[in-house]
């Protein structure tokens, strides 16, 4: 976070006048503006909300009155908080008297921001603020929903927070006075409701500090302003003039031909693109990454924005990534029943897990295929064969019926497997996955006249792999060959394309992690195959890729995702044994977000929509899901 001296400062009146001039003397106001008075005793967590906004918004700046800091603007969140937050006496507690408070509030009301008011002293005052809030509720131009958020965690929690914050002073603190404030806040909460002022209570004792902002937004939406989006305006540059940045972030929606919504201009935060913002992000370069993919965005790179909200699809990518993991966490780890999300798209349509290791099919591979590996070259060679077979069908019921093919009993096992395949087809049972399209495999059948039977084509393909297994194993296990080179080698097999070759390589890349047996020298974090879905997702997020290839962007996203989650106030709930996301996870999420943005953009009639809504509906089971618990790496057991 910047020091006090590093913040941009501007007089409130000058800032307002500059805004009027920038917007043609008519400031554009959002329809979901709010004023929230956060109340609570010491240790209740009032200042945590603006403090978290301050720490996660690099575009934050100060508004002054007579040369003194009087308000903190968080443009990325669309909020301004009365007061400053560089010292313990922040918020409304830094104002001299009520007259100064009302003077600053009057000036801030003209700005296109939602407003936060919070302070310890003001938390116990009722009549003055009740009259003020009822008067503010009647104001227009702009119209703001006004409400009182009463933070009432258990009093013991408040004391524990105070003790943690100032342990050296805790014994001398007058705890009875703090308890008196807690009771006053609780009592006044009902008095506000009786007077007709929107007032609601919240217990934030179990809210992680990194979830504070998103929790705050949800609280507003659920209790004060149903239309509140909590969307960021996307103004990020701490060095950019606030008025210039805000004007770009708040540009109105134009209508193109046929009534489709288009972005005001094909530009985003800066006339020179978003390269400066992207270059400002902290990158974590992993030592095993190939430097040829570690490109740096130039000034031609542009992020796409939602024309209605100004929010970047870049931010939406990370927000939805965390929400998809939250769905998994609530369903599998917490064992909750539906609904697992409030997101209307994710609650309706199917999106795969962020981490491939959590998918049912991959878990089955770990349990039923990897368990057969022994620490010998022959066993490793036949794991390669069985992995190809598994990813050819991607249907556990099929490979379970076939059984594992061992080197010691190869002839018997292979005959049994072929018989099982033919039996499933004859009985009408599905042989191949329905999760995605598997090509007809005709090119694997040398008898083209009899290549209409896809199951027989698959048998021919497996036989080809068996016939060339020594060659494939030698190339795969040669440490001189990279993951990318091995994938290219796999595509030389008839009917095996980049996608299937990549899937096999990914499975091989987790063998050592899951078994502890040395296998190959790569992991899913060494390379990513960028397929059509991933490309489409990237082209949604980026209006212009500039000098970056799609693969460059996958590496770039992976290198900055931790910092971006922190900037957005998001927490990713890693499964046990996992400390970070790999290239495959971020590449795969680009693909999933292409489905999300297809629906999102098409439903809104945006001219950059690239497809229709997802085909597959969410149909996740709510009964026993213990089999979906993550498998723990042998390397961390």
Swiss-Prot record:
Residues 249-269 are annotated as: Disordered. Transmembrane segments: none annotated. One of its GO terms (biological process) is symbiont-mediated suppression of host innate immune response. InterPro entries: HMUDK/HMUD1, HMUDK_hel, P-loop_NTPase. It catalyses: 5-hydroxymethyl-dUMP in DNA + ATP = 5-phosphomethyl-dUMP in DNA + ADP + H(+). One of its GO terms (molecular function) is catalytic activity. The keyword Metal-binding does not apply. Keywords: Host-virus interaction, Inhibition of host innate immune response by virus, Multifunctional enzyme, Restriction-modification system evasion by virus, Viral immunoevasion. Mutants hmdl and hmd2 are heat-sensitive mutants defective in thymidine hypermodifications with accumulation of 5- PPmdU and 5hmdU, respectively. Phosphorylates 5-hydroxymethyluracil (5hmdU) into 5-phosphomethyl-2'-deoxyuridine (5- PmdU) on DNA as a step in the pathway leading to thymidine hypermodifications in the viral genome. The phosphate is added internally to the DNA polymer. As a final result of the pathway of hypermodification, alpha-glutamylthymidine (YdTMP) substitutes for about 20% of the thymidines in the viral DNA, the 80% left are dTMP. These modifications probably prevent degradation of viral genome by the host restriction-modification antiviral defense system. Belongs to the thymidylate kinase family. 5-hmdU DNA kinase subfamily. The N-terminus contains the 5-hmdU DNA kinase activity. This is 5-hmdU DNA kinase. It comes from Bacillus phage SP10.
């Amino acid at each position: 976070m910047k020091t006090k001296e590093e913040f941009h400062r501007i007089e409130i009146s000058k800032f307002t006048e500059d805004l009027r001039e920038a917007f043609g003397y008519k400031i554009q106001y959002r329809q979901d503006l709010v004023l929230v008075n956060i109340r609570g005793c010491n240790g209740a967590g009032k200042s945590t909300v603006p403090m978290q906004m301050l720490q996660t918004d690099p575009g934050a700046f100060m508004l002054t009155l007579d040369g003194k800091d009087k308000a903190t603007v968080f443009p990325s969140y669309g909020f301004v908080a009365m007061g400053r937050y560089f010292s313990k006496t922040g918020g409304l507690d830094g104002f001299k008297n009520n007259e100064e408070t009302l003077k600053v509030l009057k000036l801030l009301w003209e700005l296109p921001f939602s407003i936060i008011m919070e302070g310890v002293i003001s938390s116990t005052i009722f009549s003055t603020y009740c009259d003020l809030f009822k008067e503010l509720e009647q104001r227009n131009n702009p119209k703001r929903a006004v409400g009182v958020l009463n933070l009432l965690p258990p009093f013991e929690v408040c004391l524990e927070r105070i003790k943690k914050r100032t342990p050296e002073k805790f014994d001398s603190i007058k705890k009875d006075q703090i308890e008196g404030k807690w009771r006053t806040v609780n009592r006044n909460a009902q008095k506000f409701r009786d007077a007709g002022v929107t007032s609601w209570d919240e217990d934030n004792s179990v809210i992680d500090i990194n979830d504070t902002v998103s929790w705050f937004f949800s609280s507003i939406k659920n209790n004060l302003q149903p239309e509140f989006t909590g969307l960021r305006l996307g103004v990020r540059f701490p060095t950019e003039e606030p008025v210039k940045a805000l004007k770009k972030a708040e540009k109105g929606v134009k209508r193109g031909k046929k009534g489709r919504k288009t972005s005001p201009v094909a530009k985003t935060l800066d006339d020179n693109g978003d390269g400066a913002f992207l270059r400002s992000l902290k990158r974590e370069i992993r030592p095993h990454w190939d430097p040829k993919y570690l490109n740096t965005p130039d000034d031609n790179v542009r992020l796409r924005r939602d024309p209605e909200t100004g929010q970047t699809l870049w931010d939406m990518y990370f927000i939805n990534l965390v929400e998809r993991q939250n769905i998994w966490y609530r369903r599998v780890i917490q064992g909750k029943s539906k609904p697992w999300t409030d997101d209307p798209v994710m609650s309706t349509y199917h999106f795969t897990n962020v981490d491939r290791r959590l998918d049912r099919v991959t878990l089955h591979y770990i349990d039923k295929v990897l368990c057969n590996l022994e620490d010998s070259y022959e066993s490793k060679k036949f794991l390669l064969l069985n992995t190809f077979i598994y990813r050819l069908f991607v249907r556990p019921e099929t490979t379970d019926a076939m059984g594992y093919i061992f080197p010691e009993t190869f002839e018997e096992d292979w005959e049994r497997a072929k018989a099982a395949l033919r039996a499933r087809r004859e009985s009408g049972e599905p042989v191949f996955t329905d999760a995605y399209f598997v090509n007809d495999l005709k090119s694997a059948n040398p008898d083209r006249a009899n290549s209409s039977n896809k199951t027989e084509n698959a048998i021919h393909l497996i036989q080809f792999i068996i016939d060339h297994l020594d060659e494939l194993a030698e190339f795969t296990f040669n440490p001189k060959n990279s993951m990318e080179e091995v994938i290219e080698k796999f595509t030389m097999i008839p009917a095996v394309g980049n996608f299937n070759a990549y899937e096999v390589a990914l499975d091989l890349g987790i063998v050592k992690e899951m078994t502890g047996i040395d296998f190959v020298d790569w992991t899913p974090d060494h390379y990513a195959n960028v397929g059509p879905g991933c490309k489409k997702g990237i082209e949604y997020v980026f209006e212009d890729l500039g000098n970056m290839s799609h693969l460059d962007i996958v590496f770039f996203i992976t290198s900055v995702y931790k910092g971006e989650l922190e900037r957005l106030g998001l927490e990713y709930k890693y499964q046990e044994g996992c400390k970070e996301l790999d290239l495959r996870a971020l590449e795969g999420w680009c693909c999933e977000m292409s489905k999300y943005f297809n629906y999102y953009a098409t439903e809104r009639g945006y001219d950059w929509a690239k497809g229709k809504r997802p085909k597959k509906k969410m149909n996740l089971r709510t009964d026993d899901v213990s089999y979906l618990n993550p498998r723990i790496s042998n390397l961390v057991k």
